């Protein structure tokens, strides 16, 4: 009887330790720097997206949300929005003229059609990936919706600092993305119950070259489109 009781106590203790370890959540923090050509240094790094995926490839639960990218001043605001997959993004038109939001991304092409001031169109992003978005009327309008299959992500501050909160202890692959860095960057790391503090992580944008996108028909924008500025 004593052996059975002792074994049960040890089993209960092990289960308690495992439960506490599994529920332990920390914050992964660090800072991103952007390497650019002379004269092109960015002062705002809020377009940098950081996320963590379990190193073993385990699937994690995400919660879809509804968020907004406003069309104002012939710009997408914010220019970059990060969401969990299956989230809905609304595109309210706050300008005094019409817009036509579209994307040609293979896993999520869409076209809102032309709509006037005060109207809102929306799109649900079902698959993870980076979705460039444009306006078919205004050629300089470019934005991005970054859709992730993980709840562990953050958008950097102006100075490049980031903090991904609520990360369970374990091994992860850290991903960093910026639209001017073709390959992005990845880093494997172990997250303890208290999280992980990283140093400065450089992203190399020196190879970036601007290329004007085509309209939704795959054609060059007309001069009349440019005159709308």
Description of each model-found segment:
Residues 1-2, 98:
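Intrinsically disordered, low-complexity peptide-like regions
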Residues 2-12:
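Bacterial N-terminal signal peptides that target proteins for export
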Residues 13-17:
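Hydrophobic helical h-region of N-terminal Sec-dependent signal peptides
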Residues 19-21:
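N-terminal signal peptide c-region/cleavage motif recognized by signal peptidases
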Residues 25-229:
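Extracytoplasmic copper-binding redox domains, predominantly the cupredoxin/blue-copper superfamily
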């Amino acid at each position: 009887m004593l052996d059975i009781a002792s074994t049960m106590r040890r089993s209960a203790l092990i289960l308690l330790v495992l439960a506490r370890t599994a529920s332990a959540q920390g914050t992964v923090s660090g800072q991103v720097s952007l390497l650019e050509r002379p004269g092109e240094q960015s002062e705002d790094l809020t377009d940098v997206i950081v996320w963590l995926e379990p190193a073993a490839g385990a699937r994690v639960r995400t919660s879809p949300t509804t968020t907004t990218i406003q069309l104002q001043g012939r710009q997408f605001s914010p220019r970059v929005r990060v969401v969990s997959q299956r989230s809905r993004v609304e595109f309210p038109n706050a300008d005094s003229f019409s817009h036509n939001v579209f994307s040609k991304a293979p896993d999520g092409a869409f076209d809102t059609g032309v709509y006037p001031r005060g109207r809102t169109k929306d799109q649900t992003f079902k698959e993870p990936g980076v979705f460039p978005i444009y306006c078919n009327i205004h050629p300089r309008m470019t934005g991005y919706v970054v859709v992730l299959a993980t709840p562990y992500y953050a958008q950097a501050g102006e100075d490049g600092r980031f903090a991904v909160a609520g990360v369970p202890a374990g091994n992860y692959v850290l991903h960093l993305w910026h639209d001017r860095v073709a390959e992005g960057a990845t880093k494997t790391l172990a997250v303890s119950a208290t999280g992980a503090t990283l140093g400065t992580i450089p992203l190399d944008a020196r190879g970036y070259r601007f290329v004007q996108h085509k309209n939704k028909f795959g054609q060059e924008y007309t001069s009349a489109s440019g005159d709308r500025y």
